[in-house]
Amino acid sequence: MADTLPTHAQAVIIGGGIHGCSVAYHLAKAGWSDVVLLERKQLTSGTTWHAAGLVGQLQGSHATTAFASYGVELLQEIEAETGQNPGFRQNGSISIAVNDQRLAELRRKADFASLFDVEASFMETAEIAKRWPLMN
């Protein structure tokens, strides 16, 4: 990190949140060496710090699902590459249908998951009650 700002740069990124850091990272990976990232406080100390950081990998389209899956892969690669733990944990999730329309959507998502190697399964009410008896 430089103590003074350079007079020129190939790219100047304003904001050291998740998006700004990602742009700087990807430019550097692409071979750019003249990149400046400006942040008024500490990296990821603003909105990024306050975010829950949830990454739902199954989205409504191929493009957004691929983007979310890439984000998960990237977090794993960054830890392997740098030795720094980004604090990312894969916990999974449960989605519950309260009507027939939502049930159809969840069935579609469970089928859709296999296209992206995202582990997903569809459970009927009886199986859920057996696995998690306290769930009402």
Descriptions of predicted regions:
Residues 17, 40-41, 99:
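Fold-independent oxyanion-binding glycine-rich loops
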Residues 8-9, 32-33, 91, 118:
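Short coil/turn connectors at secondary-structure junctions
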Residues 27-28, 113:
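Hydrophobic alpha-helical packing residues
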Residues 53-134:
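Dinucleotide-binding Rossmann-like beta1-alpha1 core, especially the glycine-rich loop
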Residues 3-19, 36:
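Beta1/beta-strand and adjacent pyrophosphate-binding region of the FAD-binding site
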Residues 3-6, 29, 88:
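Short, flexible hinge/linker loops that cap or flank conserved catalytic cores
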Residues 28-49:
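Glycine-rich FAD pyrophosphate-binding loop
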